[in-house]
Each structure stands twice: as C-alpha cells, then as structure tokens.
Amino acid sequence: MRGPDAEQEDTLDANVVHKLVREIEAKDASTAAHTWRVVLYLRAMLEERGVRGEDLMLATHGAALHDVGKLDIPAEILQKPGRLTDEEFEVIEQHTVTGYARMIALDVDEDIILDLVRYHHEKMDGSGYPFHLNGEEIPRIARDFAVIDTFDALTSHRPYRHEVGHDAGDKAIAMLVEGKGPKYDPQSVDLFAELYRNGKLDYILNYFNDGAELPGYGSVDDEELTRSIRV
C-alpha cells in the first residue's frame, strides 16, 4: 500500500526527469523534438501490448532520459557537424555507461528506466554498444527502443534529407524489416511496422517532427504532458 507521501514522491521523481531533460535540451537543441517522438513511439508500442499504469509511466521516464549520459560528452564532440573520428565515437559510445551511472547516483532502481538508459544501442547480432550483447541478453524494452531510435534517426527532419513524412517512413520501415533478426528484434519490428502501416504513428511522425513548433519536453509539466500524449 502506498503511504501518505507517495503522491509527493511521484511529483519529485517527475521533477527530476524534467530537470534532467531540460539540461539535455540546453546542451543539444535537436534533442527536444527527438525526445517527444521516442517517448510517444514507445508508449504506442507498449499500450498496444496492454501495458498500463506505473510500468507505462516508468517507460515514459526511461525514454525521456535515454540520452542523459550525453550531459557528460564534451559539446565540441556532441555538436560536431562533420564526421566523428574513431576516438570521438568511442567517447559518444560511453553515454550509455555514464547515463546509467547518473541514474544509480540518483538511487533509481527501476529496471525499465535503467535498461533503457544502459542498453538502448545494443543490437541483436552483438554489433551494438557498449557491451555487444546478443539476442535475448538485451532486455525487451531496449530491443523495442532500438527499433524506435533507428526509425526516428531515419525520419527526423534534416537539412540534407529530401524524404520526409511517409516517404521517409516507408523507407525506414523497409530497412527495419530487412534488418529483422540480425539487427533488430523481430517481434519489436513487426509490432512497430503494424502500428505504422495502420496509421497509428502518423501524428507523431508529422506534428512532432517540427522541433521549432514544440516546447521542450522538459519544460512541460505533468498535466500538460498527459494531455499531449493522449492526442
């Protein structure tokens, strides 16, 4: 049973999430729209599976904080416009490790959050980072998120990208399907592709893909966030 301070504790936890996300957005402006999208994509997948309540909210927090380790990456590397050197990419790879350490330092012990932060760049064939895990060694939530993160990277607005909206989305889904098994969890790909083809992700792909039109995820309070994720 929850004690009398449970509601206040939840509010404090949410405040920590928003504070950290605001710090990430301040360091890397492109993060704001990305955070909205990956949170909403993950919620769509989990709700389709019937996940509700606390687990859904924890997953939302984990998705919002998945890149918290980037706070420890030097700005000249994080915001570098050109190709990263091998040494610079090794620094980037450490953001999952430092992000996990930040969560532990905050006494976060929920596996959903920790697994998202630590393992979201792992791939089914062991080619991911930082631990090169294989298959079911990777927690389910991180396997889901790998699909989402890849889709978002391939469909987010970029000055050099000619395809946007469904043109980009169709290509991204085709690539994920091609990588199903070797790179991406088949169940995760199938579910995400079904949601996409049924139009259930359209509002995220379209409305939430214009960072200039969105408030930073970390600047929205819980009540407004709840309204936003129910559109």
Tell where the protein language model's regions lie, with residue ranges.
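Metal-dependent catalytic cores of enzymes that make or break cyclic nucleotides
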Residues: 7, 11-231
